Regions:
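Metal-dependent nuclease catalytic cores that hydrolyze phosphodiester bonds in DNA/RNA
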Residues: 1-214
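Short acidic (Asp/Glu) and glycine-rich catalytic loops that position anionic groups and cofactors
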Residues: 29-33, 235-240, 291-294
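Short amphipathic alpha-helical face segments that pack within enzyme cores
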Residues: 51, 218, 254-262
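Hydrophobic/aromatic-lined pockets within catalytic cores
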Residues: 56-61, 221, 236-239, 264-268
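Metal-dependent nuclease catalytic regions and adjoining charged, substrate-binding loops involved
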Residues: 91-106, 153, 245-253, 261-347
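Secondary-structure boundary elements
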Residues: 191-196, 221-229, 264-278
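Glycosyltransferase-associated regions of secretory-pathway enzymes
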Residues: 194, 207-216, 223, 332-347
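Non-catalytic protein-protein interaction segments used by genome-maintenance enzymes to assemble
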Residues: 204-253
Length: 347
C-alpha cells in the first residue's frame, strides 16, 4: 500500500468527505473540489477539533505544531494584522518593516514616520513573545484552550470505557517460547507473528471496484488472535446529550461504514486475512467542548447501519462516482445522462 502522498494532499482518491460533497452538492461540485478549484473550509470549530485530536492521539506531533504563548497576545484584529505584516515583511531594514506593518493596520494620517516608528516599536515590544512564537511557525494556543485540553484528557482518563479505548499506540507479538520473549525485549521481532496492534491517525489507501479511495481513521485496534477489529472515532460536539442530532446532521454512520470498508480491504490485501472471518466494533468518543466538558462513548451496532440504509447509500454513491470518473461527465447526475434529462426525487 503506497501512502507516500500525505492524506490531505492526495486529491486523486475518494474520501468520506468526497462522498458527502457528491451527495449534498452534486458531481460538478465534487469535481471542482478534487481539482482544487474550491478551497477547504476553515472554521474555528474545525481548527479546535484538529487541535484536540492531535493532543489526544499524537502528543509528540502536538508539541511540534502548537505552542502556548507566555507573553501578551494581540488584543484586536489590528494588532494581529500588524504582527502578520511584520513577520511576513521582506524589508531588510527593521525600522522600515515596523513602519510598514503599523501602517497596514492603523491610520497614520497626520503622523510622521518617526512618530509611527515609535508607536510600532512600542507595540512590537509588548508583543515580542507572540511575534517570536508566530515566527517559529507553530500555532499559538490560548490559556483557555490549554485548560480545555487538560479537562478533556482528565475526563477521558476517568471514563471507564474511553480510557480503555484511547491508549497509546502499541504492537504486541505472540511469544510461545523464552527465545521469543528475548526477541521482543531486544527489538528483534522480525518473523514473530503479531497478536495485537493499536494505531492512531491510521492512513489507508484502498480501492472499491477499481475506484481509488482513501481513509484516515482516528484509532484502529486489530486483534489478530481473536480476529476482531475496533474502530474508534473522536467527535467534538455541543450536542453531547442529544448526539443523535449530530449523527444525522453530519452522517457519521456513513463515515464509520466507509471506515469499515477500508479496514476490511486492508485486512484482505495488506495482511492476508479473510475479513469475513473477523468481527468488528465501532465506537464514537464524543467530547463536549463547552460547559461541563463531559465525555460519552457510543457503541455503534450493526443494526444502526442497516436501519439507516448506510450500506446501500455508500455503494450507490461510489458506483455513481466511479461512473463519472470513467466517463468524464461531471456536469449533471448519472440519471440525467442516462435518460431524457428528467430526474427523480428520493422522497
Amino acid at each position: 500500500m503506497d501512502i507516500s502522498i500525505p492524506y490531505y494532499e492526495d486529491m486523486s482518491r475518494i474520501s468520506n468527505s468526497a462522498i458527502g460533497w457528491f451527495l449534498k452538492k452534486g458531481p460538478a461540485f465534487l469535481r471542482a473540489k478534487l481539482d482544487g478549484k474550491i478551497p477547504d473550509e476553515s472554521t474555528p470549530s474545525l481548527e479546535k477539533g484538529t487541535m484536540i485530536h492531535m493532543y489526544l492521539l499524537q502528543p509528540e506531533e502536538f508539541v511540534n505544531t502548537y505552542k502556548l504563548c507566555a507573553g501578551q497576545k494581540p488584543k484586536s484584529t489590528n494588532q494581529e494584522r500588524f504582527v502578520q505584516e511584520l513577520i511576513n515583511s521582506t524589508e531588510i531594514e527593521s525600522d522600515k518593516a515596523l513602519i510598514k506593518a503599523y501602517k497596514s493596520a492603523y491610520s497614520t494620517v497626520g503622523r510622521t514616520d518617526a512618530e509611527t516608528l515609535s508607536k510600532a516599536q512600542q507595540m512590537a515590544l509588548e508583543l515580542k513573545d507572540y511575534i517570536a512564537d508566530t515566527r517559529s511557525g507553530k500555532k499559538i494556543v490560548s490559556d483557555y484552550d490549554m485548560r480545555l485540553l487538560g479537562w478533556i484528557k482528565t475526563n477521558i482518563d476517568h471514563h471507564k470505557m474511553a480510557s480503555k479505548l484511547l491508549r497509546p499506540e502499541f504492537t504486541i507479538y505472540e511469544t510461545k517460547a523464552p527465545e521469543d520473549e528475548a526477541k521482543v525485549l531486544t527489538g528483534k521481532t522480525e518473523g514473530l507473528p503479531i497478536a495485537e496492534e493499536l494505531h492512531h491517525e491510521f492512513h489507508i489507501n484502498w480501492e472499491y471496484k477499481g475506484l481509488k479511495c482513501k481513509s484516515l481513521l482516528d484509532s484502529l485496534h486489530l486483534d489478530f488472535k481473536h480476529k476482531r477489529y475496533t474502530i474508534m472515532d473522536l467527535k467534538t460536539t455541543v450536542k453531547l446529550y442529544h448526539f443523535e442530532d449530530s449523527m444525522k446532521e453530519y452522517d457519521y454512520l456513513r463515515q464509520l461504514y466507509y471506515y469499515r470498508m477500508a479496514v476490511e480491504w486492508y485486512l484482505e490485501h495488506e495482511r492476508g486475512e479473510n475479513p469475513k472471518d473477523w468481527d468488528w466494533d465501532c465506537f464514537i468518543i464524543a467530547m463536549n467542548t463547552i460547559e461541563q466538558k463531559d465525555v460519552r462513548v457510543f457503541h455503534i451496532l450493526s443494526s444502526d447501519f442497516y436501519n439507516d440504509n448506510t450500506t446501500e447509500r455508500i455503494e450507490d454513491a461510489l458506483e455513481a462516482i466511479k461512473w463519472h470518473t470513467e466517463t468524464g461527465q461531471w456536469e449533471h447526475s448519472r440519471e440525467y445522462y442516462a435518460g431524457n434529462g428528467c430526474e427523480t426525487l428520493n422522497l
